[in-house]
């Protein structure tokens, strides 16, 4: 960089842009770590000017969605900016200028928590601890960026933006070598039924990481395989309660962070020093003589458990039935009362109509008599012979009206009680009789179920045990036995949930050790 003429006046800050364009397409392989080291300094001790630097990677994919990624809760957040129409993403976000180049980026805890779901260009960029020192007349700000690159498409543009006077930049980029393969311990057993940990995890998670490489941690704690075996807690026997079923366990007594018995989890993402690992518990063996040789223990069952359950069920159903019956009885009584009112109104209307009809008949008879008297006075015969028509008379039947008056009230003709096989009238109200009927019926039903409960439970237990015994065999892995081994062979049985976990490698899975 050419040396500029200096004056006695206070030098003004000069913006220097350093843009390094690296073609990483040919170098990038799935999951490789590259160390990007950048050092910068000043030729003159600056005490009055603000200096700042920010590192950015210009890519063709917006990563705003990854800011809310649940797999990277503590990873550095991104800020998006557009320069000349192109997106530029900064790690970490700008937080204002500080003196002497002390950026807030040095305080970030950027341990990766990846892989990202759906990442196509890179995985988990994070910063190393920055080193700053005063070297005489130089001010040094050193930053190291680790890039976990995979499936790179296009060109990464690494840009270091510097505010200062005559900056000096040193840039280096090199690949971190892969760590050595772990050594497997010598296991004292003839054979152990086990399964590849990545196969178990991928089948349980239903391929939750379609675009990220799955790897395992090369340094302890590590687990290329897990041990699955059958451990029966208690034996089955006759009784009124369900016995304990056979449970399949994974021994993790050698795992540093977990002790005792532990079921395989679906989310075993562990953060390590230089990468990420999908871990399952390591293999450890258990002496079967201490597990299966002991006599099976049975939990003492309460003899009144079934009776208590039946009575509780009966009381609950009785309360529900009484409440429903009382509500139904009240609604039926209200309906009958309304119908009685309507019936009384109809009877009154019919009687009034009958009375009006009788009055009309009296008027007609009176008019007939008047016409007959008038015709006879004039020297004619009566009305009917004169007009040569038969005489008509109104005859009203009163039998239906009499029967309508003999009707009893509707409440006396309609019963509000349910029709039970046994029905009596002890002078009690309808609600009390209905409650007694409900209680007796449910009590008899509970007694009937108590007599059938042992048979039903026995049939269900035998069916479940039969299904458990039909589990398929599990893949076996052989280990060289030792003469002084105290371990015995484990049973190669496994539940049906592990039947599909054959160690077949998916196309998109890379089982190389994570850097």
Swiss-Prot record:
Transmembrane segment boundaries: 437-457
SUPFAM superfamilies membership: Virus ectodomain
Free-text description of this protein's post-translational modifications in UniProt: Specific enzymatic cleavages in vivo yield mature proteins. Envelope glycoproteins are synthesized as an inactive precursor that is N-glycosylated and processed likely by host cell furin or by a furin-like protease in the Golgi to yield the mature SU and TM proteins. The cleavage site between SU and TM requires the minimal sequence [KR]-X-[KR]-R. The CXXC motif is highly conserved across a broad range of retroviral envelope proteins. It is thought to participate in the formation of a labile disulfide bond possibly with the CX6CC motif present in the transmembrane protein. Isomerization of the intersubunit disulfide bond to an SU intrachain disulfide bond is thought to occur upon receptor recognition in order to allow membrane fusion.
Segments of this protein annotated with the region Immunosuppression: 365-381
Quaternary structure note: The mature envelope protein (Env) consists of a trimer of SU-TM heterodimers attached by a labile interchain disulfide bond.
Keywords for this protein: Cleavage on pair of basic residues, Coiled coil, Disulfide bond, Fusion of virus membrane with host cell membrane, Fusion of virus membrane with host membrane, Glycoprotein, Host cell membrane, Host membrane, Host-virus interaction, Lipoprotein, Membrane, Palmitate, Signal, Transmembrane, Transmembrane helix, Viral attachment to host cell, Viral envelope protein, Viral penetration into host cytoplasm, Virion, Virus entry into host cell
Motif stretch (CX6CC): 384-392
Glycan-carrying positions: 129, 203, 230, 251, 256, 271, 287, 351, 398
Residues exposed to the Cytoplasmic side: 458-515
Site positions (Cleavage): 301-302
Annotated segments matching region Fusion peptide: 304-324
Lipidation feature positions (S-palmitoyl cysteine): 455
GO CC annotation: host cell plasma membrane; membrane; viral envelope; virion membrane
Disulfide bridge partners, by residue number: 212-215, 212-392, 384-391
Pfam family name, one: TLV_coat
Function statement: The surface protein (SU) attaches the virus to the host cell by binding to its receptor. This interaction triggers the refolding of the transmembrane protein (TM) and is thought to activate its fusogenic potential by unmasking its fusion peptide. Fusion occurs at the host cell plasma membrane.
Signal peptide positions (record): 1-33
Origin organism lineage: Viruses, Riboviria, Pararnavirae, Artverviricota, Revtraviricetes
Coiled coil: 330-376, 388-420
Extracellular side: 34-436
GO biological process: fusion of virus membrane with host plasma membrane; symbiont entry into host cell; virion attachment to host cell
Free-text comment about domains: The 17 amino acids long immunosuppressive region is present in many retroviral envelope proteins. Synthetic peptides derived from this relatively conserved sequence inhibit immune function in vitro and in vivo.
Protein name, entry field: Envelope glycoprotein
Motif (CXXC): 212-215
PANTHER family xref list: ENDOGENOUS RETROVIRUS GROUP FC1 ENV POLYPROTEIN-RELATED (PTHR10424:SF73), VIRAL ENVELOPE PROTEIN (PTHR10424)
């Amino acid at each position: 960089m050419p040396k500029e003429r200096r004056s006695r006046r206070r030098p003004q800050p000069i913006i220097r842009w350093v843009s390094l364009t690296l073609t990483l397409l040919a170098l990038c392989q799935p999951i490789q770590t590259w160390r990007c080291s950048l050092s910068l300094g000043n030729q003159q001790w600056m005490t009055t000017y603000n200096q700042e630097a920010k590192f950015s990677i210009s890519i063709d994919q917006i990563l705003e969605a990854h800011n809310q990624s649940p797999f990277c809760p503590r990873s550095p957040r991104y800020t998006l900016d557009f320069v000349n129409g192109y997106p530029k993403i900064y790690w970490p976000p700008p937080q204002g200028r500080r003196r002497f180049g002390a950026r807030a980026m040095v305080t970030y805890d950027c341990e990766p928590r990846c892989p990202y779901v759906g990442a196509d260009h890179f995985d988990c960029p994070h910063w190393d601890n920055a080193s700053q020192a005063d070297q005489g007349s130089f001010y040094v700000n050193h930053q190291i960026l680790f890039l976990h690159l995979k499936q790179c498409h296009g060109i990464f543009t690494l840009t270091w933006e510097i505010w200062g006077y005559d900056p000096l930049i040193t840039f280096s980029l090199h690949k971190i070598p892969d760590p050595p393969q772990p050594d497997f311990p010598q296991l004292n057993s003839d054979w152990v039924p086990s399964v590849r940990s990545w196969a178990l995890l991928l089948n349980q998670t239903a391929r939750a990481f379609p675009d990220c490489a799955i790897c395992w941690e090369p340094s302890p704690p590590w687990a290329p395989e897990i041990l699955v075996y059958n451990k029966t807690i208690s034996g089955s026997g006759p009784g009124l309660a369900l016995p304990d079923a056979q449970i399949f366990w994974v021994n993790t007594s050698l795992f540093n962070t977990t002790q005792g018995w532990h079921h395989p989890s679906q989310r075993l993402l562990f953060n390590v020093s230089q990468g990420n690992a999908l871990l399952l518990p390591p293999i450890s063996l258990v002496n079967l003589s201490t597990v299966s040789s002991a006599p099976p223990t049975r939990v003492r069952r309460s003899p009144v458990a079934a009776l208590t359950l039946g009575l509780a069920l009966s009381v609950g159903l009785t309360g529900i039935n009484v409440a429903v019956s009382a509500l139904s009885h009240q609604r039926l009584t209200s309906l009958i009362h309304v119908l009685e009112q309507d019936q009384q109104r109809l009877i009154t209307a019919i009687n009034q109509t009958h009375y009006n009809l009788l009055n009309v008949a009296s008027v007609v008879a009176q008019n007939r008599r008047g016409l007959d008297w008038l015709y006879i006075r004039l020297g004619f015969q009566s009305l009917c012979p004169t007009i040569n028509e038969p005489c008509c008379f109104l005859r009203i039947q009163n039998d239906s009206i009499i029967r309508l008056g003999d009707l009893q009230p509707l409440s006396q003709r309609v019963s509000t009680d349910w029709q039970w096989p046994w029905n009596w009238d002890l002078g009690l109200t309808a609600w009390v009789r209905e409650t007694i009927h409900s209680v007796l019926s449910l009590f008899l039903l509970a007694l009937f179920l108590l007599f059938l409960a042992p048979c039903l439970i026995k049939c269900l237990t035998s069916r479940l045990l039969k299904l458990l015994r039909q589990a398929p065999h599990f893949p076996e892995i052989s280990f060289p036995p030792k003469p002084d081994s105290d371990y015995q062979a484990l049973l190669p049985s496994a539940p049906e949930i592990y039947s599909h976990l054959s160690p077949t490698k998916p196309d998109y899975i890379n089982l190389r050790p994570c850097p």
